[in-house]
Amino acid sequence: MIIPIRCFTCGKVIGNKWESYLGLLQAEYTEGDALDALGLKRYCCRRMLLGHVDLIEKLLNYAPLEK
């Protein structure tokens, strides 16, 4: 869905790092190197980006108000 603004465990702001993370992955960084470059050292914050599935574009195809 939408990337969480803060880490669920420690509360660090991570929402502003999603676009940068995707850019680093496009630039052939590994997942671990991209997270290190963004300054995400705690495993709780790292899992927030690694485990995120971006489904918002797919869900917009199923607007319930349109008939």
Swiss-Prot record:
The keyword Transcription applies. This is DNA-directed RNA polymerases I, II, and III subunit RPABC5. DNA-dependent RNA polymerase catalyzes the transcription of DNA into RNA using the four ribonucleoside triphosphates as substrates. Common component of RNA polymerases I, II and III which synthesize ribosomal RNA precursors, mRNA precursors and many functional non-coding RNAs, and a small RNAs, such as 5S rRNA and tRNAs, respectively. Pol II is the central component of the basal RNA polymerase II transcription machinery. Pols are composed of mobile elements that move relative to each other. In Pol II, Polr2L is part of the core element with the central large cleft. Zn(2+) binds at residues 7, 10, 44-45. Component of the RNA polymerase I (Pol I), RNA polymerase II (Pol II) and RNA polymerase III (Pol III) complexes consisting of at least 13, 12 and 17 subunits, respectively. GO terms for biological process: transcription by RNA polymerase I; transcription by RNA polymerase II; tRNA transcription by RNA polymerase III. One of its GO terms (cellular component) is RNA polymerase III complex. It comes from the Eukaryota. PROSITE patterns: RNA_POL_N_8KD. It is found in: Nucleus. Its main location: nucleus. SUPFAM superfamilies: RNA polymerase subunit RPB10 (SSF46924). The gene is Polr2L. Disulfide bonds: none annotated. The keyword Zinc applies. InterPro entries: RNA_pol_su_RPB10 (IPR023580), RNA_pol_suN_Zn-BS (IPR020789), RPABC5/Rpb10 (IPR000268). Keywords: DNA-directed RNA polymerase, Metal-binding, Nucleus, Transcription, Zinc. Belongs to the archaeal Rpo10/eukaryotic RPB10 RNA polymerase subunit family. GO terms for molecular function: DNA binding; DNA-directed RNA polymerase activity; zinc ion binding.
